[in-house]
Every structure is written in C-alpha cells, then in structure tokens.
C-alpha cells in the first residue's frame, strides 16, 4: 500500500496539497471533485489517450494520419476528437489540424505519475515513499522509465555498474555501507571520480571498517576533498547515481530495502534522483564518526 509517513511535516504537506486544489469562486470541494472526475472519464479511453500522446509527439495533425497511425476508422477517431475538444484538451485549427491545448499538454505530463504507480502497483503494495517530501512525490512520473530490479545479487551488481560507469562523480544516500562495494568505489575515487554521500546515523557498517579506511588511504582522499560526506538522523530512501544513470530503493515497512530497486539512464529519471540528493545534502548535518557502530 502506498503510504506517507505520519509526522508533522508530512501532515502539513498533505494539508497544503488539499489547499492546492482549492480556489476562490467554487462553492465547495464536491464541485471540484465532480469536475475532476469528468476529466478522468474523458481519459478513461485507450484511443483518447493514444490521440493525446500522438499529438504530444507531433503537434498539429489531421484526422486522416491519426486514424492511420491508430489503426482505427475516421468516424471512430472523429468521435473521440470531438470529446477531447469539448473537454478542452485539444483544439481544432482553421486548417483542420488538431493540437493540444495547454491543459492537454499538462495532462500528458501528469499521466506518467499514474503510469509509474499502476505499472508497479504490486511493488507499492509492500513499499512506500517513506520520508520523501510531497513535492518529489508529485514528480513521481519522472521515474516512469525506471526498470524494476529484484534480488540483492542483482541490485548490488547494478550498484557496482553505476560505480564502474562513473567518470565525473558518484552521489549516494545510504542506510548501510555494503562491504563488497568499498573497493570498487575507492578505486574510482583514486582515478579522479568525486564521491559525495549521506549516511544514516544508524547505518549498518562492516566490522573492521575503521582499520580498513586507514589502510586504504580513505582519510587522505577525504582531506583533499575527493570525498565529502554528511549525516542525517535516518535514511529510508536509498539513492545511488553517477553523472548519467541512477538507482533508487524505496523503503519497506519504514525501513530501507536494498533487495529491490528502480534503475534508469534516462535524463528525466536521473534529474529526479539528482534533485532529491541535492535536497537531502542541503538539509543534512555534519558527519559524526562516533555515531556509527561496527
């Protein structure tokens, strides 16, 4: 089940979301919900959705090429074009070509969020968005291109590949520090890759970590700013990214779950993960070694 953390911040965000859809001049929320439900009804058609996205790909099309691309009759497509036009999602130009309105374009941008959640509905029966701020949840459609990877062996393998493919940087938000990932990231840092990470105060760390860090030259890399690190109270959502690809692990029962991830090298997916990392980095505190227990 998709849930949100029940804390003051999240409750305030949910209230703000409720206020967001209110506006002056409406009698009550029922009127707004009724209007929204009417628009959902217009979108509850595979052909009408296809028409919208065909127009998004290439704005301004006549009915004939649309019907051909959709493999439908002109009469059938015309009927759906009329419905979309009446709802304000598209408009018909004087030359007979159809194009998306601002409203129609915006709806196409919002649909990927529904697509992402519906495509991975089974996954989100057990996982949730944890402590992700609402403003990022509202951008969940940017994650729609992500591939779902399941199994700790496969997720760690993909994690290592993100390290391997990095040429500029690796950024991470960590709930634990997997021992098998230490050597791969250290080698990349020594080859000039910038490493920044945020770790939970309660992070699980391998035995002998301190000794290994000293022998590896980790602290010298930290001194010359090749490595920068911060700390936050807890980490529910784990993120790993380089300059061109990213992974995200959502929590299960409020705890970070490294056995399943979403991965993509799509620019929009990467942008979401990078923005989220920067948000957490800005709001994280100073790294305190004594809080990590081996």
What role is predicted for each listed range?
Residues 161-217:
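Primarily the HKD phosphodiesterase
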Residues 202-240:
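HKD-type phospholipase D/PLD-like phosphodiesterase module
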